[in-house]
């Protein structure tokens, strides 16, 4: 039997992740809860639709639209596929002037020859680019644990503008080869923030960020939170398809729908902190983007819907999807009388169903919703 080292296994795993996301049903069976967030229609918008301003400023950069292409891949076997995906997405981001993230750079740290699969500056010189490393790699009990050297390498090798630290305890816990060392991560991130001159974004990957975690992250100086909520791609489902034995399959299956729905995570983080929020996890149209922004997000991130055109190198296909979302967002803003994203955050919203039940137990919902008027 041929023994594969852990770094090579990481590269192979990245390819398997893309393959399953393209070919299998990998989304959560439960919703983002955006369906329980409602706008109040206004019959007299008192604005012109074509004059609505969709631009936002986040982390010191101005973007034409409040949308981010979320990190998906990098460092796959042979690197060509990941490189093709990232360059396609980057060209779209450049065209639309929106930010973009890359997938986990762990493969690049251990196998530097994969760096080109993450590099997009040749096709997107102006985009706000976010690098990506995993939280477990900074844990105190992790062999060869990461520090500022690896963080700088992740950012500077691809000429990124910020670094995302992805928190994925769910995926790691159901992955046979998963890294479940998380002790000391908060301390490590606090130290990293003290030494790294680039913005750090704490990023979940499908299970959501609670207000308790958000408060801890804000207290150590983290610059922004990507909530990565439940309702979109379930990485437990991806590990279900990867599993080689019944025990591993059963564990991943049980946790397929674990987490905090995206809409509720956005509300919790906004209620508890003043940090910029990126809403990812099941964002599938411009109406959901509008609801995320109204709940307090600064950007909404999209991943899975863009993967298929990106795999085919179809830049126009990626732009077409994003443009549809933009058109839908603009239409929502017109129908609620919001001439800007700042105004959208003030319009009345109504919370019903499970979302209301959850938020009434977790936050002061009345305080969160009151005084919302233009």
Curated annotation (Swiss-Prot):
NCBIfam families: IPP_isom_2
GO cellular component terms given for this protein: cytoplasm
Protein name in UniProt: Isopentenyl-diphosphate delta-isomerase
Gene: fni
The UniProt record lists the keyword Metal-binding: yes
CDD domains assigned to the protein according to its UniProt record, in alphabetical order: IDI-2_FMN
Function (record text): Involved in the biosynthesis of isoprenoids. Catalyzes the 1,3-allylic rearrangement of the homoallylic substrate isopentenyl (IPP) to its allylic isomer, dimethylallyl diphosphate (DMAPP).
Residues making up the signal peptide according to the UniProt record: none
Source organism of this protein record: Thermococcus sibiricus (strain DSM 12597 / MM 739)
Molecular function (Gene Ontology), one example: magnesium ion binding
Transmembrane regions: none
Record-listed E.C. numbers: 5.3.3.2
Quaternary data: Homooctamer. Dimer of tetramers.
Cofactor requirements of the protein: FMN; NADPH; Mg(2+)
Residues binding substrate: 13-14, 104-106, 171
Gene Ontology BP, a term: isoprenoid biosynthetic process
Cellular location(s): Cytoplasm
Residues annotated as binding Mg(2+): 172
Binding site for FMN: 71-73, 104, 132, 203, 233, 282-284, 303-304
Alphabetical keyword list: Cytoplasm, Flavoprotein, FMN, Isomerase, Isoprene biosynthesis, Magnesium, Metal-binding, NADP
């Amino acid at each position: 039997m041929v023994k594969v080292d852990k770094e090579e296994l990481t590269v192979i795993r990245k390819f398997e992740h893309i393959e399953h996301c393209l070919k299998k049903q990998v989304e959560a069976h439960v919703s983002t809860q955006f369906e329980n967030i409602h706008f109040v229609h206004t019959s007299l918008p008192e604005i012109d639709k074509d004059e609505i301003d969709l631009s936002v400023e986040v982390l010191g950069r101005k973007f034409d639209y409040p949308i981010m292409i979320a990190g998906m891949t990098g460092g796959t076997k042979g690197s060509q596929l990941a490189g093709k995906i990232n360059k396609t997405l980057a060209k779209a981001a450049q065209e639309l002037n929106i930010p973009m993230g890359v997938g986990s750079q762990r493969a690049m740290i251990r196998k530097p020859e994969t760096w080109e699969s993450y590099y997009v500056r040749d096709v997107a010189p102006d985009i706000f680019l976010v690098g990506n490393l995993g939280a477990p790699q900074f844990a105190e009990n992790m062999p060869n644990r990461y520090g500022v050297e690896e963080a700088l390498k992740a950012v500077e090798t691809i000429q990124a503008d910020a670094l995302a630290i992805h928190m994925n305890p769910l995926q790691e816990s159901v992955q046979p080869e998963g890294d479940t060392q998380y002790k000391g991560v908060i301390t490590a991130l606090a130290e990293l923030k003290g030494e790294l001159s680039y913005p750090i974004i704490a990023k979940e990957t499908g299970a959501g960020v609670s207000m308790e975690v958000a408060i801890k992250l804000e207290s150590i100086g983290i610059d922004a939170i990507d909530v990565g909520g439940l309702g979109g791609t379930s990485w437990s489902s991806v590990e279900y398809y990867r599993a080689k034995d019944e025990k591993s399959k059963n564990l991943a299956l049980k946790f397929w729908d674990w987490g905090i729905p995206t809409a509720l995570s956005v509300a919790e983080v906004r209620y508890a902190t003043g940090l910029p929020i990126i809403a990812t996890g099941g964002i599938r149209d411009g109406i959901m983007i509008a609801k995320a922004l109204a709940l307090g997000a600064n950007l909404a991130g999209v991943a899975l819907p863009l993967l298929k055109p990106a795999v085919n190198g179809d830049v126009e296909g990626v732009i077409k999807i994003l443009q549809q979302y933009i058109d839908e967002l603009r239409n929502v803003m017109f129908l609620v009388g919001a001439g800007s994203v700042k105004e959208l955050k003030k319009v009345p919203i109504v919370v019903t169903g499970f979302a209301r039940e959850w938020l009434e137990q977790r936050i002061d919902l009345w305080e969160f919703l009151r005084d919302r008027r233009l």
